[in-house]
Regions:
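Beta/alpha (TIM)-barrel catalytic core signal, keyed to glycine-rich beta->alpha loops juxtaposed to Asp/Glu
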Residues: 1-144
């Protein structure tokens, strides 16, 4: 239970507590009723699943968003998405690197794991902390 995790945190047994896949209404409820709010909420988040409302709520609650599927699990042809590929080509990056950058630029921590990341190297991601890329600033689901 959440209370047990709060106790572990308060006793120094764990360094952080968080949740996974909490919808905005559930996260708001937990944040209002918990002694210690969650520090992170892991959700599927990538250009085709943007989670705008959830991201807004996480920011309001002071919860760090974390994308557990920043590559859409390699599904829906995401690595061949025309816009992602065009942006990547402009900056000399792969579609995978563009997807990581998109999340990081929005303040989202990323976990590039699983089969999709094994098939798609993401080395050389130091570009993640460079200036904001204008093409990604206004990315919406409608442009994907």
């Amino acid at each position: 239970s959440w209370r047990a995790m709060e106790e572990l945190y308060e006793n120094g047994k764990i360094r952080a507590i968080g949740v996974c896949n909490f919808l905005p209404d559930r996260l708001i409820d937990l944040c209002r009723n918990a002694s210690i709010p969650p520090m992170v909420n892991q959700v599927e988040m990538h250009p085709l699943c943007q989670q705008k409302e959830a991201l807004d709520v996480m920011r309001e609650c002071g919860v760090q968003p974390q994308a557990w599927a920043p590559f859409a699990e390699g599904m829906r042809g995401i690595f061949k998405n025309k816009l992602l590929c065009a942006i990547g080509q402009k900056y000399g990056k792969t579609a995978a690197q563009v997807m990581l950058r998109w999340n990081v630029q929005r303040g989202v921590a990323v976990i590039p794991t699983g089969n999709a990341s094994k098939k798609t190297p993401v080395s050389g991601i130091s570009f993640l902390m460079n200036r904001i890329w204008k093409p990604l600033r206004t990315w919406t689901k409608d442009t994907a």
